[in-house]
UniProtKB/Swiss-Prot annotation:
Family: Belongs to the TRAFAC class OBG-HflX-like GTPase superfamily. OBG GTPase family.
Lineage per the UniProt record: Bacteria, Pseudomonadati, Bacteroidota, Bacteroidia, Bacteroidales
Protein name as annotated: GTPase Obg
Domain OBG-type G: 163-329
Ranges for domain Obg: 4-162
An annotated GO cellular component: cytoplasm
Species: Bacteroides fragilis (strain ATCC 25285 / DSM 2151 / CCUG 4856 / JCM 11019 / LMG 10263 / NCTC 9343 / Onslow / VPI 2553 / EN-2)
Top-level enzyme category: hydrolase
The entry's keywords: Cytoplasm, GTP-binding, Hydrolase, Magnesium, Metal-binding, Nucleotide-binding
Cofactor needs: Mg(2+)
Amino acid sequence: MAESNFVDYVKIYCRSGKGGRGSTHMRREKYTPNGGPDGGDGGRGGHVILRGNRNYWTLLHLRYDRHAMAGHGESGSKNRSFGKDGADKIIEVPCGTVVYNAETGEYVCDVTEHGQEVILLKGGRGGLGNWHFKTATRQAPRFAQPGEPMQEMTVILELKLLADVGLVGFPNAGKSTLLSAISAAKPKIADYPFTTLEPNLGIVSYRDGQSFVMADIPGIIEGASEGKGLGLRFLRHIERNSLLLFMIPADSDDIRKDYEVLLNELKTFNPEMLDKQRVLAITKSDMLDQELMDEIEPTLPEGIPHVFISSVSGLGISVLKDILWTELNKESNKIEAIVHRPKDVSRLQQELKDMGEDEELDYEYEDDGDGDEDDLDYEYEEEDWEDK
């Protein structure tokens, strides 16, 4: 299979910068032989920062840039001169990116807004220069603080697409056809199952310049939540959707049963998915006359809005848009904060292996060569840092 440009999982090694050493310099001038300490503070190590960017919609740009390392802070110097702060490392990610610790599976953070910045790893604070430690009884301290050490972590970045409506259905249910009919998206469409191999997004225009975003994911089959088919990998892309549009073709042997199978797969994957608003669309309904529609109506699932549609003939499309817009704007449909559960590490590693993302990313770095002038052991307490 050709390598896809849609990358929603990537493993990267991150390392912040260590703080620069404080200086132990003693002031020495022609007419000031005993000038005392004037060593400056070390610079702060650079942070590793995630920044949301709506111009990205996959993690492809990170697949070949697996090491994110911030700069180290420089050492302080004479005349109480501060060392230069290390350069921050900013990682641009698409909105909807979730971060997990690759070793423990624990949730770390997520980025959902354009321009949102999250400090993933903090750089070490710079060490205090010796002038901070001058006292009445200690006029010439010949020690300074070392900078705080760097932090490092290997993380998994997982993309969960941000959309208002998520399309849910079996393969070949007409999801991609609907998306292409009501938006400018051009997903691959063919008369065989599993045509859609990766998620697609489309912006659906409504009235008065209003619009909403629709996401199409590969078809779900029974057992998808256990890893069958393509469903498991892509089910997470509808976790953030406000509303789920279930699509079942009119020629189904049992529409209610198919709906319950789909619902059960979502429940098994994440029980919270059942809290989302749902709409049912019976697709390919241009093959039905009104009499057949009337016969099918009583057999449909109860308690959710439904509509007969045909993406080819346009039957019911405007009604579907009205229903979706109404449901999206209900007060009960506002998404609450998503609870990100820890990942099963063994399952996570297997997914990474399947996608070729399981390579070791430990990075051997060289010493920054700050010199040995200030390389003195100093046991300091936390209060040494305060109010400095």
